[in-house]
From Swiss-Prot:
SMART domains: Ubox (SM00504). PANTHER family: OS02G0152300 PROTEIN, U-BOX DOMAIN-CONTAINING PROTEIN 32. This is U-box domain-containing protein 32. Its EC number is 2.3.2.27. ATP binds at residues 466-474, 487. The keyword Metal-binding does not apply. The lineage of its organism: Eukaryota, Viridiplantae, Streptophyta, Embryophyta, Tracheophyta.
Amino acid sequence: MGEIGGEELVLDVDETIFVAVAEDVERSKTTVLWAARNFSGKKICLLYVHRTARAASWTHKKLVGGSFKKHDVKVIERVEKPKVDELMNSYLQLLSETEIQTDKLCIAGQNIEECIVELIARHKIKWLVMGAASDKHYSWKMTDLKSKKAIFVCKKAPDSCHIWFLCKGYLIFTRASNDDSNNRQTMPPLVQLDSDNETRKSEKLESSYMRRRLRYWRSLLEQDGEKDTGQLEREKVEPRAPPLFSSGSSSSFGEPVGPEPVSPELVDSDTLNTSNVEEKEREGDVARKVHRYDKAMHDIGQSDRTVYGEAGKKWEEDASTTEALCKAKALEGLCIKESSQRKRLEELLEKEKLEVKMVIEQNNGFMKELQMVQGRNLKLESQMRKLQDLEKEHGEKFDTAMELLKSFRQKRDEIRIDHENAVKEVNALRRLVKGETGESSGSEMLDYSFMEINEATNEFDPSWKLGEGKYGSVYKGNLQHLQVAVKMLPSYGSLNHFEFERRVEILSRVRHPNLVTLMGACPESRSLIYQYIPNGSLEDCFSSENNVPALSWESRIRIASEICSALLFLHSNIPCIIHGNLKPSKILLDSNLVTKINDYGISQLIPIDGLDKSDPHVDPHYFVSREMTLESDIYAFGIILLQLLTRRPVSGILRDVKCALENDNISAVLDNSAGDWPVARGKKLANVAIRCCKKNPMNRPDLAVVLRFIDRMKAPEVPSSETSSYANQNVPRRPPSHYLCPIFQEVMKDPLIAADGFTYEAEAIREWLANGHDTSPMTNLKMEDCNLIPNHALHLAIQDWQNQW
């Protein structure tokens, strides 16, 4: 065992509490803090045994005058001492906040417990605090020592040392010293007992006497060692007690001594080879003196144990008494605590009893309610069985009624067919009897059954669907060997059967070349049957996504004229018909690019509300008045006319055209794909469109005036000097194509609409029918009837056109 330091440490063991610490700070942290709390008036010295691999090779016998070369000692110190200093600084930092005087005693050795025992004996340590076991072994029942080191120190340490053994910061065991009764004055507060003054004086005298004897023998040994500074270490050294050295008194290791032989690795081979007989004799003298010193120290220890033996027994008795009193107080405290807990548990028990009583009462109430619910459940089950029987009975009746309904429908369809055939026969007989040739004032509309509609649309095959919107879905169909378009109206806001048939009858009488012909209806399914137009809509021509050839500017002006003519015809009808939802998708084009307006009069069959405010085709005044008027159709026509001129997105078209007109640069917005627009005509048409889109409906022009103006735009261009007004009476011009009779190719004087939807001169179509023709002069298809309807709107338009010239 060797001390880390070169000089011997002088300690005041009466005022110092020694605390044995481990290499791991966390393991000894609670022990150090416990000592700091309980011995605040004492000085604390940290006792640390540094276990190193070379400790076994160090000798436990002090070599006089430098047994190692100074170079070897410094080499060992440089390797081990920094580690020890770093560890001690960690412990001192832990105690720095307690304001307790601290010191450290560090030694190097192989066996930690033996080194601690030797330190106690060498320094006469009176008060020692050390661990009883690792923290993981702690329990509140723990009263015995678990650590082998603690057990060894408890058994082998001198009886003069009072030792406290702790675990996890709790005092586990106390080993009293045999001289506690003689050291009551210097005892720390934790173990101090009453003692008389004689005992304290005796303790001080004995302690000072032992210290003087120890210093005397050490001085003799050092004097002899100074004379033999050249002495070498022998191969075998006699065992002796290890010297103790202060950790901070020197910058080098102290001379290592101990019961184990010195390792040959630490002995300079050159020094051993130069040894001689004289040096061995002097070394023998020194060894004999050391042996005498050790024997004297042993005698001193024996005398100490004899002197303090009786005092130790008395102190043990006093300690036992004190411990018994402490246990009694602890038991008294436990009894009081147990009594309070018992009282609290009794209160909790009473509370639980009340709660159990309440739960039992609630349970009884629930049981009564359960019995009532079960009784009601039985009644409900019986009622449910009765309802199930009624449901079964009604189901059978319903099935029977459905079969009857199916048979009635079949009979109705048969009767309807018979009725239609009978009506045709009656009409034919009347014409034969009265000599009529188709001058009937009206036409009969055909009603179709739902079964016929279902069969015509292939049971509403999704692949046959042409489109779907807010106001119904449109399917393609084959009805009586003709291609038709079936529009299924929505069910909400539907009229009653009679009113629906009446209004459809009115729409069926409306015939115009630029209107899609309404061929029939199915009141049962609220569906309308129109003629099928296969060439798409005007919206397809405006869209850049479809590969549709662009319309020429001549075709666009003609289409605008046809739209205006059809609207004027609807507005002139009796009763007046408002389209209400005019937009490019509602304007169809046939194979000859002839305009066919669809969905006219839908607002009379279903309520049109909730129109989208973002739709530019909707009249802004509608959102104020919530009413569709003739001016609403004029506004929509103005927007469509602007689209025909520019083919621009409808969202900002009105603003763009106004800006171009203000800057006198209408050619910047005209659609170049239509060809070379006549700039003057384009500007005039744009002005007409802007007038149609006036915010105030009262400022919008009449459609008859607009139609006359657009028709004039279809004529060859005239010089600007001659176009100061709507017409120049002296300039010859060609009449619009729809003013000409398809048969005579002359301007019609009395236009009549035939069953094929075309308008003819009255004389021409009557002569055609009188010659026995039952097919259309235009399509060569068989006409449904020979009824003719006057086209008043077209007649008025022709008269206005003729009046201009």
